[in-house]
């Protein structure tokens, strides 16, 4: 949103708050809200697309908020891939840094998420291939920029009528202990090493989540619906078996080592007996994803080349990302400086070239 071509704004009340948006965005209608903002669907007169407009709530109320706002904007600006949600527009009604207080982000409006899809029907193997292929294609891109999603689950995967998929909300997930407690989907898809702080985790935490999602698509039910952290780990180990000594010895946490050593030894189950009737190639891939040892877990790039995706895999059309500068993560700045840098990012945004063939949901 460069200064020289500032659009005309109009105001609209949404859920008792005033939204001030460029006139190109019409018919604002609330579709959801969370801790970090409210989302409206809107019609973009400029492109003819239905879009999602997110107004961040109190983006600069604290250093944590301000840094999170900066992080979300930087991540969204960086992502340019068919299977990852990207930024169509970002704007503020403010005309100067001094009055800069509100940030609005515009992305594609996606019709449904994977949760809706799973509930409605048991998917064919071909559907599962196509959906998981797209998740892995998006993950290969995200991971190549050294970004970890950390919170992949069906509700973070948007799908349209044509089964085209985009990954949402990556790189932001920093859940509180409270949100991870009890019988909650936030935790069911989490890799054990991140759930229990076993060790420094890597990109493959996301692959664990893909394994959980894929198993659910194949069977129509949640793979590890734990009632709490301990029950969840028990459910996981009933399938994977208890970790081998070689893995336990590499866990830096003394507490984790002691706890796992206290558990009764369990053997790994035969996956083809657990996933009866599934495509043997699907079962083979699940075995390579749902591995406790992160060093042995398959990567997104490796998984794309697995025979299960033979009809979709194209090594020349599985792009990687430009490097993403994350040096800001270690910076300790005050609110005003995070705000100034966020304002710079808003001003410097260049919208994607619209080709008229965009994904409609």
UniProtKB/Swiss-Prot annotation:
<dbReference type="GO" id="GO:1901741">
    <property type="term" value="P:positive regulation of myoblast fusion"/>
</dbReference>
<dbReference type="GO" id="GO:0005737">
    <property type="term" value="C:cytoplasm"/>
</dbReference>
<dbReference type="GO" id="GO:0035556">
    <property type="term" value="P:intracellular signal transduction"/>
</dbReference>
<dbReference type="GO" id="GO:0045663">
    <property type="term" value="P:positive regulation of myoblast differentiation"/>
</dbReference>
<comment type="similarity">
    <text>Belongs to the protein kinase superfamily. CMGC Ser/Thr protein kinase family. MAP kinase subfamily.</text>
</comment>
<keyword id="KW-0418">Kinase</keyword>
<dbReference type="InterPro" id="IPR038784">
    <property type="entry name" value="MAPK14"/>
</dbReference>
<dbReference type="Pfam" id="PF00069">
    <property type="entry name" value="Pkinase"/>
</dbReference>
<dbReference type="InterPro" id="IPR017441">
    <property type="entry name" value="Protein_kinase_ATP_BS"/>
</dbReference>
<dbReference type="GO" id="GO:0106310">
    <property type="term" value="F:protein serine kinase activity"/>
</dbReference>
<keyword id="KW-0547">Nucleotide-binding</keyword>
<keyword id="KW-0067">ATP-binding</keyword>
<protein>
    <recommendedName>
        <fullName>Mitogen-activated protein kinase 14A</fullName>
        <ecNumber>2.7.11.24</ecNumber>
    </recommendedName>
</protein>
<keyword id="KW-0346">Stress response</keyword>
<keyword id="KW-0805">Transcription regulation</keyword>
<dbReference type="InterPro" id="IPR003527">
    <property type="entry name" value="MAP_kinase_CS"/>
</dbReference>
<comment type="function">
    <text>Serine/threonine kinase which acts as an essential component of the MAP kinase signal transduction pathway. Mapk14a is one of the four p38 MAPKs which play an important role in the cascades of cellular responses evoked by extracellular stimuli such as pro-inflammatory cytokines or physical stress leading to direct activation of transcription factors. Accordingly, p38 MAPKs phosphorylate a broad range of proteins and it has been estimated that they may have approximately 200 to 300 substrates each.</text>
</comment>
<dbReference type="InterPro" id="IPR000719">
    <property type="entry name" value="Prot_kinase_dom"/>
</dbReference>
<dbReference type="GO" id="GO:0004707">
    <property type="term" value="F:MAP kinase activity"/>
</dbReference>
<feature type="active site" description="Proton acceptor">
    <location>
        <position position="151"/>
    </location>
</feature>
<dbReference type="GO" id="GO:0010831">
    <property type="term" value="P:positive regulation of myotube differentiation"/>
</dbReference>
<keyword id="KW-0723">Serine/threonine-protein kinase</keyword>
<dbReference type="InterPro" id="IPR050117">
    <property type="entry name" value="MAP_kinase"/>
</dbReference>
<dbReference type="GO" id="GO:0038066">
    <property type="term" value="P:p38MAPK cascade"/>
</dbReference>
<keyword id="KW-0804">Transcription</keyword>
<feature type="binding site">
    <location>
        <position position="54"/>
    </location>
    <ligand>
        <name>ATP</name>
    </ligand>
</feature>
<dbReference type="GO" id="GO:0005634">
    <property type="term" value="C:nucleus"/>
</dbReference>
<dbReference type="InterPro" id="IPR008352">
    <property type="entry name" value="MAPK_p38-like"/>
</dbReference>
<feature type="domain" description="Protein kinase">
    <location>
        <begin position="25"/>
        <end position="309"/>
    </location>
</feature>
<dbReference type="GO" id="GO:0006357">
    <property type="term" value="P:regulation of transcription by RNA polymerase II"/>
</dbReference>
<dbReference type="GO" id="GO:0005524">
    <property type="term" value="F:ATP binding"/>
</dbReference>
<dbReference type="InterPro" id="IPR011009">
    <property type="entry name" value="Kinase-like_dom_sf"/>
</dbReference>
<keyword id="KW-0808">Transferase</keyword>
<feature type="modified residue" description="Phosphothreonine; by MAP2K6">
    <location>
        <position position="181"/>
    </location>
</feature>
<keyword id="KW-0963">Cytoplasm</keyword>
<feature type="modified residue" description="Phosphotyrosine; by MAP2K6">
    <location>
        <position position="183"/>
    </location>
</feature>
<feature type="short sequence motif" description="TXY">
    <location>
        <begin position="181"/>
        <end position="183"/>
    </location>
</feature>
<keyword id="KW-0597">Phosphoprotein</keyword>
<keyword id="KW-0539">Nucleus</keyword>
<feature type="binding site">
    <location>
        <begin position="31"/>
        <end position="39"/>
    </location>
    <ligand>
        <name>ATP</name>
    </ligand>
</feature>
């Amino acid at each position: 949103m460069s200064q020289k071509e500032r659009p005309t704004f109009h105001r609209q009340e949404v859920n008792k708050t005033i939204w001030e948006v460029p006139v190109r965005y019409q018919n604002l209608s609330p579709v959801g809200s969370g801790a970090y903002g409210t989302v409206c669907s809107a019609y973009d007169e400029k492109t003819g697309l239905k879009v999602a407009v997110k107004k961040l709530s109190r983006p600069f109320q604290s250093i944590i908020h301000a840094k999170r706002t900066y992080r979300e904007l930087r991540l969204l600006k960086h992502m340019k891939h068919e299977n990852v949600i990207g930024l169509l527009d970002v704007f503020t009604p403010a005309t100067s840094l001094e009055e800069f207080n509100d940030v609005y982000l515009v992305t594609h409006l996606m019709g449904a998420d994977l949760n809706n899809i799973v509930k409605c029907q048991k998917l064919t193997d071909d559907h599962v291939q196509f959906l998981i292929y797209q998740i892995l294609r998006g993950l290969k891109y995200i991971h190549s920029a050294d970004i970890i999603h950390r919170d992949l689950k069906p509700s973070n995967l948007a799908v349209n009528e044509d089964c085209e998929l985009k990954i949402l909300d990556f790189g932001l997930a920093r859940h509180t202990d409270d949100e991870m407690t009890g019988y909650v989907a936030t935790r069911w898809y989490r890799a054990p090493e991140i759930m229990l702080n076993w060790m420094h985790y890597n990109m493959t935490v996301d692959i664990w989540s893909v394994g959980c999602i894929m198993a659910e698509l194949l069977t129509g039910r949640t793979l590890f619906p734990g009632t709490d952290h301990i029950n969840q780990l028990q459910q996981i180990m009933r399938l994977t078996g208890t970790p081998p000594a070689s893995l336990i010895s590499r866990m830096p946490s003394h507490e984790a080592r002691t706890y796992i050593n206290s558990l009764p030894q369990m053997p790994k189950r035969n996956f083809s007996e657990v996933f009866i009737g599934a495509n043997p190639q699907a079962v083979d891939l699940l075995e390579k994803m749902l591995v406790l040892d992160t060093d042995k877990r398959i990567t997104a790039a490796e998984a794309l080349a697995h025979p299960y995706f033979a009809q979709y895999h194209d090594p020349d059309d599985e792009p990687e990302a430009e490097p993403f500068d994350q040096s800001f993560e270690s910076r300790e700045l005050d609110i005003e400086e995070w705000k100034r840098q966020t304002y710079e990012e808003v001003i410097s945004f260049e919208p994607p070239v619209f080709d008229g063939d965009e994904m409609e949901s």
